[in-house]
Amino acid sequence: MASKRWCFTLNYKTAVERESFISLFSRDELNYFVCGDETAPTTNQKHLQGYVSLKKMIRLGGLKKKFGYRAHWEIAKGDDFQNRDYCTKETLISEIGAPVKKGSNQRKIMDLYLQDPEEMQLKDPDTALRCNAKRLRIEYCSSFAVISLRPWQSELHRVLMAEPDDRTIIWVYGSDGGEGKSTFAKELIKYGWFYTAGGKTQDILYMYAQDPERNIAFDVPRCSSEMMNYQAMEMLKNRVFASTKYRPVDLCVRKKVHLIVFANVSPDPTKISEDRIVIINC
């Protein structure tokens, strides 16, 4: 039986094996793709749990020929959002495109933009701006590189493996520059993290409120070190805040998240409680 929508499971041993499989999925051939990383509780076997919505119908034999014979494939049930929730219940690994509810015209708008960006720019510049931003983000998040972790990055990775709480702020400190802080912070975007360089509190809260269950990375430039926004950090970490810019909304979020600050300066103990901070030195 042929279908456009499939879910898959792939057991793997190495990160290279995992990324090689993910790289087979082409943005030009699909509407939406998402996969997460899971570990079987009884065997500790690592595996990818994924979902793909293709632009064209394909049979099981065609999938195996295109993506190899190791993955297990089944026709997907539920919509894009339900499959995304299922695939990312542990860790989001890769996402291409955006989930769309049944009957929505969101994907049609993006398709129109991709067919003729210049025409949409003339007719509806605001929509064209958002579509282009989405396109660039998709391209950025679908690129992968094998990174050799520095000691501090390995330490940070171990800390992130623990469940987040509603208090701890992880502070990555390196005064020299060139230690890989921004490189690590930008890589987190590909795993669904909210990335910000700081700024005014309401600007940060407004951007975060668009999807308020994301982990958070503050990548603070050296020139902004004297204007560190501790208020926004604590409000986001506390999971209760009001975003009053443009579309006012009060948010009370149950899901706890990690919050990392990448900075060239150490935290100021007069502006934030020291017991909240876990420092990782570069």
UniProtKB/Swiss-Prot annotation:
Report the residue ranges where the short sequence motif RCR-1 is annotated in this entry. 7-10
The record lists a divalent metal cation as bound by: 38, 47, 94
Determine the domain of life of the protein's source.
Viruses
Specify the CRESS-DNA virus Rep endonuclease domain's residue ranges: 1-99
Where it sits in the cell: the answer is: Host nucleus
Cystine pairs annotated here are none
Q: Which cofactor does it need?
A: Mg(2+); Mn(2+)
Fetch the Pfam families from UniProt: RNA_helicase, Viral_Rep
Q: Which GO terms describe its cellular component?
A: host cell nucleus
Q: Which reaction does it catalyse?
A: ATP + H2O = ADP + phosphate + H(+)
Show where the record puts the motif RCR-3: 86-89
Which residue ranges does the UniProt annotation give for the motif Nuclear localization signal?
A: 56-77
Active site residues according to the UniProt entry: 86
| Motif RCR-2, chain ranges | 47-49
Q: What does this protein do?
A: Initiates and terminates the replication only of its own subviral DNA molecule. The closed circular ssDNA genome is first converted to a superhelical dsDNA. Rep binds a specific hairpin at the genome origin of replication. Introduces an endonucleolytic nick within the intergenic region of the genome, thereby initiating the rolling circle replication (RCR). Following cleavage, binds covalently to the 5'-phosphate of DNA as a tyrosyl ester. The cleavage gives rise to a free 3'-OH that serves as a primer for the cellular DNA polymerase.
Q: What else is known?
A: The genome of nanoviruses is composed of six to eight segments. In addition, some isolates contain subviral DNAs.
Q: Relate the assembly described in the record.
A: Homooligomer (Potential). Rep binds to repeated DNA motifs (iterons).
Q: What is this protein called?
A: Para-Rep C1
List the source organism. Answer: Faba bean necrotic yellows C11 alphasatellite
